Amino acid sequence: MDTQVEMLLDSILVACPQKIFIKKVKQIKKKYSFRNKDTMQSIRELCSLLYIVDQEELALQVASLIDKLEYKGDMLIWMNVYGVITVESLIYAKRGEDEKVKTCRKTIEDVYLYYGDEAEQRLSMKIFKRVMNGEGFYLDRIEQDKESKDLKAEIFHHLLQFEELIYIRAMGGSEAYPIEKLDPMIEEEKQFIAKHIDKALF
């Protein structure tokens, strides 16, 4: 890990002293490798969490650690790359930087929809349509967490729900979930997680 990355991670702890940020930074420092899916997942989650607590510049800096990584055929690794790209897209959309929003979308599409042979592309398109229709939502899990009064699990599932929503937004929205419907839903998830950030631990 080079000094710049270490300085970035240390600056996050100054801006965000909550336990969840300490944990994510520790996880990233422990094994700083882009081939390690746990590290990549921690980078993605850290990026989302920074956006949620209104640290957009830090979120962009964390995203830039992995947003240029090429797809090498391992979707478990690359889903974390497109995860940070969706956060970038959200920030650029807020700032009215439409060209950057388009670039984010194209980067995801090139891998997610157009990688592999025809059969693979057909399957990807099928999955993509289901995701865009909200079939990957975590609303049932969130309800279960509420019933069992498991706040930690509920916060985590709200984060996953947030990430589903910002993915749909980054890809231009859909008939079921146009951008004007997505934005208040994203804001609701953001507010919930921000409110309970001290209790977040995953």
Q: Model-found features: residue ranges?
A:
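N-terminal leader/linker segments that initiate helical-solenoid repeat arrays
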Residues: 1-19
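Flexible helix-coil transition and linker loops at the boundaries of alpha-helical arrays
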Residues: 29-37, 69-78, 114-120, 147-152
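Eukaryotic alpha-helical solenoid repeat scaffolds
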Residues: 127, 131-202
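"A position-specific structural signal for the A-helix of alpha-solenoid helical repeats
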Residues: 6-10, 45-48, 80-87, 121-129, ...
